[in-house]
Amino acid sequence: MAKEKEKLFSEFPPVSREAWIDKITADLKGVPFEKKLVWRTNEGFNVNPFYRREDIEDLKTTTSLPDEYPYVRSTRMHNEWLVRQDIVVGDNVAEANEKALDLLNKGVDSLGFYLKKVHINVDTLAALLKDIELTAVELNFNCCITRAADLLSAFSAYVKKVGADPNKCHGSVSYDPFKKQLVRGVSNPDWVKMTLPVMDAARELPAFRVLNVNAVNLSDAGAFITQELGYALAWGAELLDKLTDAGYKPEEIASRIKFNFGIGSNYFMEIAKFRAARWLWAQIVGSYGDQYKNETAKIHQHATTSMWNKTVFDAHVNLLRTQTETMSAAIAGVDSITVLPFDVTYQQSDDFSERIARNQQLLLKEECHFDKVIDPSAGSYYIETLTNSIGEEAWKLFLSVEDAGGFTQAAETASIQKAVNASNIKRHQSVATRREIFLGTNQFPNFTEVAGDKITLAQGEHDCNCVKSIEPLNFSRGASEFEALRLATEKSGKTPVVFMLTIGNLAMRLARSQFSSNFFGCAGYKLIDNLGFKSVEEGVDAALAAKADIVVLCSSDDEYAEYAPAAFDYLAGRAEFVVAGAPACMADLEAKGIRNYVHVKSNVLETLRAFNDKFGIR
């Protein structure tokens, strides 16, 4: 008996795709599921409500193993990513060193140093890296691109001075030859000439990556996932193309490239993006010859939680955003991760927020053991399909950039910047209409929060004194317009009072008063909700007694034909009158002079801006 294999599911016959579709259609009362349940993404492909085994049988990404070309599943036989935390190095280099040593004792194994206004030489690096074992931690340096070669030379000299093995010194210098065009809006057609000294200075540091594909800037500017990946591939391919023409071998260049991606809030798509990046980059490097379909074709991916979806208001929600973002990058098998502190949008992060950010990664390692499993999403019908769909769309974009003359041409003509900025505008429109939700900002705001006093960080950190000759990326965060709206209310010294005139059908009046409170709360208005009134006259009198600036009628569609005209006439222009909903009788109500409505199809941002203008809040 012990050897008999019990067939637990023998009584359940396989269910065909057609049977599933018939059942779904029946549940939708005859409406084709394509109209209701198919997600038409911004990435250029549709996502179905269910997938089956046959959906992945012919996919190119399901046959390889981890650490096997084309490396879809992983570039290594483990998932021990590095926990990175960055340090801004100011005038006090010793203080930065003290902080670095403290971080190393708290679980960090990758350090990032932002060198600002620091004289770069061996002595400076000696002070900065004092007591740090160079071969035991990844060291990443960020400085002006004009100082990258000097930094590499100084670091190489320091490695020799302390007797460390340069082959075991891992890290990077954030040399990005396209930052001028993309971020600063300044032409840089001779970037190859600038790059050669950087490559030469790195020769004695074979494990250092000095060519950065900073696709995170695209993510922070609101790029769609396929744009971030497609342009990143074209970016990396341009480095390979132009530097091989300059005399370097493909393996010399590929081993120097580091891809810095952003991590957005689209959980499953982000997992698929990193998997697709490994696959497609391996294809690009492998196209130089079969001899490169090995270690040379392995992508090196660093991931940073995106700034685009982070908020000033209800900032602790940023913790939820960064946690799921970190999970997607860890599951996808990136090489290292930076989690931005939750307060990064409004102040210089403090010890508390940095500790929380650091522990978000350590939690996934020490408590959840994400580092013990390689590519757990492999075999998922959904994620395997997403990997292919994202890969195909990104590849199309990559080819279009190549056909148009390559990444340099695209950056110099600002075609990349314009495309990403158009996506930024589209996403802002989605935020304005709540198709893209920012919890605590454009939906379910904290009514009593005041944020103006806590903002100490100057906005526009990507600006410089350069004279722009081409269009740069627009780094306005998704929540920025709602934040500006609410901050204007705070600074005006006048807080409009919104009074909910609830009457009639109990369920509908409660639902609409809650909806309207969340609607007007996004502008920081004072909200007065009510249990209900016996008549519109009673409600209007109570509103005027409360010195309401806006009176919102909350009832059912069927009752608006009676209540709305009566309330509007009795109010007699003593406050703004709003109907919560879009009733069938709207045309009749408009004919009687009722112009203001709030409902699920409203442009929340534009509606609230209009009210701010009426109250002189700018």
Swiss-Prot record:
Keywords: Cobalamin, Cobalt, Isomerase
Domain of life, source organism: Bacteria
Entry-linked Pfam families: MM_CoA_mutase
Assigned EC number: 5.4.99.2
Keyword Isomerase: yes
Catalyzed reactions: (R)-methylmalonyl-CoA = succinyl-CoA
Assembly and binders: Heterodimer of an alpha and a beta chain.
Membership in a protein family: Belongs to the methylmalonyl-CoA mutase family.
Stated name of the protein: Methylmalonyl-CoA mutase small subunit
Organism: Porphyromonas gingivalis (strain ATCC BAA-308 / W83)
Name of the encoding gene: mutA
